[in-house]
Swiss-Prot record:
Transmembrane segments: none
Protein's UniProt keywords contain NAD: yes
Any single Gene Ontology cellular-component annotation: nucleus
Family statement drawn from the similarity comment of this UniProt entry: Belongs to the NAD-dependent glycerol-3-phosphate dehydrogenase family.
UniProt source species: Lachancea thermotolerans (Yeast)
Entry EC number(s): 1.1.1.8
Record InterPro entries: 6-PGluconate_DH-like_C_sf (IPR008927), 6PGD_dom2 (IPR013328), G3P_DH_NAD-dep (IPR006168), G3P_DH_NAD-dep_C (IPR006109), G3P_DH_NAD-dep_euk (IPR017751), G3P_DH_NAD-dep_N (IPR011128), NAD(P)-bd_dom_sf (IPR036291)
Catalytic activity entry: sn-glycerol 3-phosphate + NAD(+) = dihydroxyacetone phosphate + NADH + H(+)
Name listed for the protein in its UniProt record: Glycerol-3-phosphate dehydrogenase [NAD(+)]
Signal peptide start-end: none
Gene3D superfamilies, sorted: N-(1-d-carboxylethyl)-l-norvaline Dehydrogenase, domain 2, NAD(P)-binding Rossmann-like Domain
Binding-site residues for substrate, renumbered to this chain: 182, 340-341
Length: 411
């Protein structure tokens, strides 16, 4: 539920005032429910009631926002489900139809988009999860984004340059975006956030979403929380006319998926990218049978390295984000406990196979988000490991798994 403590972490006095007003308004409505009725409600019913009241407190906009999700993997489809549910419930804020761009594939002789639009399930990447009927799978990227006011990027980050190049000149000039991608744009000029890359290439303001969000659990509507970071642009049109924190909360918040909106885009982006390197170490620990104590040490050292990295390359990022937000330590714990990176690293340690081989065996066509290239050495262990969407203070070159873990633990 919305709390006073979280109001203090918003970006401006005006935002704080509005958040406090909405909180008081919602509290009054909750108090109006007779206790005899409230005590009979299940926990899920209470979450739904609170969710509905909070959403009603968001001011209607002049023109409802059209939302498009770019990406349809397991996480992309899950976020599309969340967004489409909210779009259907809030016609005063969003256009009911939500487009989800799908890279067209054939599954059992039928186009994946046709399956999604008729059976309302993504049978390849998110099977056995029912999707809202107002979620439309669209294989034409330009068609999917042309009228969108809010773009939600949720694709493997290595495809971002190609996608962005196709979007140039084909989106609204005043569109806003949220990136669910994990990683950095690294060049000779330095390190950039992927949200910054989107802003520079498309000329639109882009925030980020990250948190302790294993896609299958969110899709099954197990209770989860996440963090959305968005800094209001200089050309902000005003409340009711443009995307702000309240609109983003209404877009992503569900009774089973609680959202906190802040403005530290760098903080949650750094945490979301570098957690995967730490998860790699935890997977090797598990595969070698070193136990939970060693895994905890990897996570402790890893969190410290993440914070140092953030302070070095993005000095405006806030240390408290790593500790207080779902995108920080909570996401690190979740990813190191059961994410795809842990599974791949564990399998590598147990079998001596390359990352590519393990990905093919375990991930149904998806990537582990950690490697770009792994060469097999004569001993069977990776002879060159280069992080794909994040990196550490030391190169992973010609290291056995045990040496790699030792390197991770040195500070």
């Amino acid at each position: 539920m919305f709390s006073i403590s979280r109001i203090t972490r918003t970006s401006s006095f005006t935002t704080q005032f509005r958040a406090l007003y909405r909180f008081k308004h919602s509290a009054r409505k909750l108090q109006s429910i007779p206790f005899s009725i409230y005590k009979k409600m299940s926990a899920a019913d209470r979450l739904n009631q609170t969710h509905d009241i909070l959403s009603e407190s968001v001011q209607a906009v002049e023109n409802p926002f059209k939302v498009t999700v770019i990406g349809s993997g397991n996480w992309g489809t899950t976020i599309s489900k969340v967004v489409a549910e909210n779009a259907a419930l809030r016609p005063h804020l969003f256009v009911k139809r939500v487009d989800m761009w799908v890279f067209e594939e054939t599954v059992d002789g039928q186009k994946l988009t046709e399956i999604i639009n008729t059976k309302h399930q993504n049978v390849k990447y998110l099977p056995n999860i029912d999707l809202p009927e107002n979620l439309v799978a669209n294989p034409d990227l330009v068609s999917a984004v042309k009228d969108a006011d809010i773009l939600v990027f949720n694709i493997p980050h290595q495809f971002l340059p190609r996608i962005v190049s196709q979007l140039q000149g084909n989106i609204k000039k005043d569109a806003r975006a949220i990136s669910c991608l994990k990683g950095f744009d690294v060049s000779k000029d330095g390190v950039k956030l992927l949200s910054t890359y989107v802003t520079e290439k498309l000329g639109i303001t882009c925030g980020a979403l990250s948190g302790a969000n294993l896609a299958p659990e969110v899709a099954k509507e197990n209770w989860s929380e996440t963090t959305v970071a968005y800094e209001l642009p200089k050309d902000f049109k005003g409340e009711g006319k443009d995307v702000d924190h309240a609109v983003l909360k209404a877009l992503f918040h569900r009774p089973y998926f609680h959202v906190n909106v802040i403005d530290d885009v760098a903080g949650i982006s750094v945490a979301g990218a570098l957690k995967n390197v730490v998860a790699l170490g935890c997977g090797f620990v598990e595969g070698l049978g070193w136990g939970n104590n060693a895994s905890a040490a990897i996570q402790r050292v890893g969190l410290g390295e993440i914070i140092k990295f953030g302070q070095m390359f993005f000095p405006d990022s806030r240390v408290e984000t790593y500790y207080q937000e779902s995108a920080g330590v909570a996401d690190l714990i979740t990813t190191c406990s059961g994410g795809r990176n842990v599974r791949v690293a564990t399998h590598m340690a147990k079998t001596g196979k390359s990352a590519e081989e393990c990905e093919k065996e375990l991930l149904n066509g998806q990537s582990a988000q950690v490697f770009t290239h792994v060469r097999r050495s004569t001993s069977g262990w990776p002879s060159a490991v280069r992080p794909m969407n994040s990196f550490c203070s030391r190169p992973f070159t010609r290291l056995s798994t045990r040496t790699l873990l030792w390197t991770l633990c040195q500070t």
